[in-house]
């Protein structure tokens, strides 16, 4: 498992028993932890606020995904590496690697601008 891999991880539910396998994009792998972003195919019914945090994977088919999908950049998830069970799906294309980097910078910039605006008026 390495950065920009797409894998399926079993994620436990927080409020009930059980869980399900979810596709994630690997951000970073260290000796002890794996950092990842969730991948979703659910986009249309999300709020504008949530949608602005979703990067649309351009080369989703070559990445091994079955349908158009988005990377949820709103939260990063950390998993202990020891005993982590995963299934390889594919790898993010160079095009998507570059575009997601630009998208992330633009997202951070808009968050900073929003925070600056809030500070001015508060």
Question: Positions of the model-derived regions?
Answer:
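Short coil-to-beta transition motif at edge beta-strands of beta-rich domains
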Residues: 1-12
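Short N-terminal helix-initiation segments at or just after the protein's N-terminus
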Residues: 15-20, 105-107
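Compact nucleic-acid interaction/catalytic patches
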Residues: 17-21, 26-61
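Membrane-targeting and insertion segments and their boundary/processing signals
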Residues: 10, 44-47, 74-77
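A generic structural signal for short, non-catalytic loop/turn and secondary-structure boundary residues
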Residues: 2, 29, 48-50, 64-72
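Pocket-edge structural micro-motifs
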Residues: 11, 38, 59, 74-75
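C-terminal terminal-subdomain/extension
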Residues: 60-122
